[in-house]
């Protein structure tokens, strides 16, 4: 495998072509953003930690029957992945009220929800990734109902697997977002699963071990990511 020119740069990763049209190299950066890019900073070694955390969690999910774009970890900052066409939607899964959901619905943060909540947002930076419903997504040509049903099924499998796994590590999986890509007629879990994309709270203390520490200027951001890496790597 030969790494070639950069295909795309996002907020947290760079994507490079390879000599194989079906694969890309994903490079994890230390850049941190919040509030749709309005707040910017860096977290030392975040890319290294998120690369490792994502690799381990994707391997776990593959073993549990969730197909992903992940092929292998190349080095401390890079992964080899299948080159997918990202569906321009994020699927958000919520087990406990927090963040925007708590604010919009007037719920106390930390309230356990009576059922898991699934939401979708339209991946569009200019519009600040608005929440939409299934009918919006189909009406504007982002997907179809059959594909959406499969996306929700993938999200549910990811939630069931990760909730159980993190529970064993003494962590509550509060909520998370995933991206899904199309590849040779299949849907694959793509992007990353890390403290950047999940809310993770210590079960005993309630301590936040995720990007909320950066969003809310709580300090000890690197230490929180390191703690997640340590527990995932047990």
Swiss-Prot record:
This chain belongs to the protein called Phosphoribosylaminoimidazole-succinocarboxamide synthase
Q: Which GO terms describe its biological process?
A: 'de novo' IMP biosynthetic process; cobalamin biosynthetic process
Q: Which residues form a coiled coil?
A: none
Catalyzed chemical reaction(s): 5-amino-1-(5-phospho-D-ribosyl)imidazole-4-carboxylate + L-aspartate + ATP = (2S)-2-[5-amino-1-(5-phospho-beta-D-ribosyl)imidazole-4-carboxamido]succinate + ADP + phosphate + 2 H(+)
Under the heading Gene3D superfamilies, the entry gives: ATP-grasp fold, B domain, Phosphorylase Kinase, domain 1
GO molecular function ontology, one term from the record: phosphoribosylaminoimidazolesuccinocarboxamide synthase activity
For the keyword ATP-binding, the answer is yes
UniProt keyword Ligase, yes or no: yes
Stored PROSITE patterns: SAICAR_SYNTHETASE_1 (PS01057), SAICAR_SYNTHETASE_2 (PS01058)
Q: Which SUPFAM superfamilies match?
A: SAICAR synthase-like
Regarding protein family, the annotation reads: Belongs to the SAICAR synthetase family.
Q: Which InterPro entries match?
A: SAICAR_synt/ADE2_N, SAICAR_synt_PurC, SAICAR_synth, SAICAR_synthetase, SAICAR_synthetase_CS
Q: Per UniProt, which keywords does this protein have?
A: ATP-binding, Ligase, Nucleotide-binding, Purine biosynthesis
Q: In which pathway does it act?
A: Purine metabolism; IMP biosynthesis via de novo pathway; 5-amino-1-(5-phospho-D-ribosyl)imidazole-4-carboxamide from 5-amino-1-(5-phospho-D-ribosyl)imidazole-4-carboxylate: step 1/2
Instruction: Quote the PANTHER family the UniProt record gives.
Output: MULTIFUNCTIONAL PROTEIN ADE2, SI:DKEY-6E2.2
EC code: 6.3.2.6
What is the enzyme's class at the highest EC level? Answer: ligase
> Sorted alphabetically, which HAMAP family does this protein's record hold?
SAICAR_synth
């Amino acid at each position: 495998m030969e790494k070639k020119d950069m295909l795309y740069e996002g907020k947290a990763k760079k994507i490079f072509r390879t000599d194989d049209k079906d694969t890309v190299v994903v490079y994890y950066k230390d850049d941190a953003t919040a509030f749709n890019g309005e707040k910017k900073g860096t977290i030392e070694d975040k890319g290294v930690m998120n690369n490792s955390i994502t690799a381990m969690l994707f391997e776990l999910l593959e073993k549990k029957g969730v197909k992903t774009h992940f092929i292998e970890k190349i080095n401390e900052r890079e992964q080899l992945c299948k080159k997918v066409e990202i569906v321009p939607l994020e699927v958000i899964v919520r087990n406990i009220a927090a963040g925007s959901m708590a604010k919009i619905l007037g719920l106390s943060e930390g309230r356990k929800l009576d059922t898991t909540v699934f939401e979708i947002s339209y991946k569009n930076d200019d519009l600040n990734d608005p929440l939409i419903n299934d009918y919006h997504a189909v009406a504007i040509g982002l997907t179809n109902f059959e594909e959406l049903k499969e996306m929700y099924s993938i999200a549910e499998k990811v939630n069931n697997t990760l909730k159980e796994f993190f529970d064993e590590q003494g962590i509550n999986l509060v909520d998370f977002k995933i991206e899904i890509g199309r590849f040779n007629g299949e849907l694959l879990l793509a992007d990353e699963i890390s403290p950047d994309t999940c809310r993770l709270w210590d079960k005993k203390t309630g301590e936040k071990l995720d990007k909320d520490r950066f969003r809310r200027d709580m300090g000890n951001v690197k230490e929180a990511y390191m703690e997640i890496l340590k527990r995932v790597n047990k």
